[in-house]
A protein has these predicted regions:
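Alpha-helical membrane insertion/targeting regions
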Residues: 2-274
Length: 274
């Protein structure tokens, strides 16, 4: 979420704000591991079934019905949305690594433009799947998905606009916001599993994702990371120690929850279907 922002002015020095940078890098390391596992699952589950023309096999994973007999357009839109989730996840990780951005700026620009195009498709296709095709568990669960999609359109547009005008520090901030909401599905899944493991069961959840915990996690999966990101920005700009301590504490707590969620999704949500 924040590792790339260490290069945004004002720069952090080892003596001034070591824990702020270290906590951001710690979160990014855990998140990158979880996102690579997510990409692997998409390729291993959906990619292999699609390559083998086993389209009905998309439904081997319960809850969402991806394949619907006779719905060629809907099926195509669904699998394009799912497979491009792997692309946008890898693209986001690529963009957040400062060494790549600094050493291969052309690659950063090309991947960045591709990220914007894929993000537009993901947002519009997600809205279409939810509200036109009806790929949802309940209207309640569709609302946060739609809010996330609209935020993605806003953030990637702002990031692209600022990049085109050479306002790089502002561009990176909006790009980080776009990274958060572009990974809303991933955040939601690790949030679910962290909640289940911490509470030793699906407290406040139901099969249609309309329980109180479901709704809270649906919105919180992107609003909480965005809030932590904004807190990090404030801590970077401010010389006040209380902002830095708050940001470090939030990031360390976020890292712990992310680690629990990553473990849960790999062990219980993805591995059983591979």
């Amino acid at each position: 979420m924040l590792a790339a922002e260490a290069t945004v002015v004002p720069r952090e020095t080892p003596r001034r704000r070591p824990w702020l940078t270290r906590s951001a890098v710690a979160w990014f390391a855990v998140a990158a591991l979880g996102q690579l596992a997510f990409v692997y699952f998409i390729v291993a589950f959906y990619g292999t079934r699609t390559a083998g023309s086993d389209y009905a096999g998309w439904n081997d994973k319960p809850l969402i019905e991806g394949y619907v007999a006779g719905d060629s357009i809907g099926n195509l839109m669904f699998i394009a949305h799912v497979l491009l989730a792997a692309v946008i996840t890898l693209g986001g990780l690529h963009q957040l690594i400062p060494a790549i951005r600094n050493r291969w700026p052309v690659s950063h620009r090309v991947v960045g433009r591709s990220f914007v195009l894929v993000a537009y498709f993901m947002a519009f296709s997600g809205l279409w799947l939810v509200w036109v095709r009806g790929t949802q568990l309940s209207p309640v669960s569709a609302i946060p998905t739609s809010v996330n999609a609209l935020l993605l359109l806003w953030f990637v547009t702002a990031a692209w606009f600022l990049a085109m005008r050479g306002r790089h520090a502002q561009h990176r901030r909006w790009a980080l916001r776009a990274f958060i909401v572009a990974n809303g599905v991933w955040f939601f899944r690790i949030g679910i599993m962290a909640w289940v493991l911490i509470n030793r069961g699906p407290v406040g959840m139901n099969a249609t994702l309309s329980g109180p915990a479901d709704i809270t996690l649906s919105f919180g999966s992107f609003l909480v990371p965005l809030a932590l990101l904004e807190l990090y920005f404030v801590a970077q700009r401010s010389g006040a120690g209380h902002w830095r301590r708050a940001a470090v504490g939030g990031l360390l707590a976020g890292t712990a929850v992310t680690a629990i969620g990553v473990f849960g999704t790999i062990a219980f949500m993805w591995a059983p279907y591979l």
